[in-house]
């Protein structure tokens, strides 16, 4: 029992730390009256290259950040709990992969936010659970489908709000597999 609680807490530590960083960045950005959107991705332009690494850290406002907080925490926690041996590698691959693909084939304009990371995590958890045919991971696949199945519609421009970058969401769908 004690080991289970430790494992749960350990899996939560990295997502909580990331979310803490996201909120601290947003608080500093707002408090200092800065606009950090230039740290996002601007496809196929030199000024947007750094955004491949930083785009998930920058959000347009607290509502954008708040909308990403719970899915980012839950999906990251699932990754670090159920895939602890490969979680770090998968997380980094999804982070960089979403940024790189958005940089290469995204629409002109700044792309910011952790939504691409969230979509990549959701698709990895879904497909990895199904492909491994291991009952606990299949259960996670079904839970991810139940909680976040509707996100698939935001991958297409027709169903996405006008200010949402659907490009990054589409490119992370075929997430990296181990």
Identify the role of each PLM range.
Residues 11-90, 103-111, 162-164:
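N-terminal TM1-TM2 helical hairpin plus the immediately adjacent luminal interfacial "cap"
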Residues 66, 70, 114-122, 167:
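Membrane-embedded alpha-helical segments of multi-pass membrane proteins
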Residues 53, 64, 116, 146, ...:
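Divalent metal-coordination and catalytic microenvironments
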Residues 171-178:
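Conserved small/polar residues in nucleotide/adenosyl-binding loops
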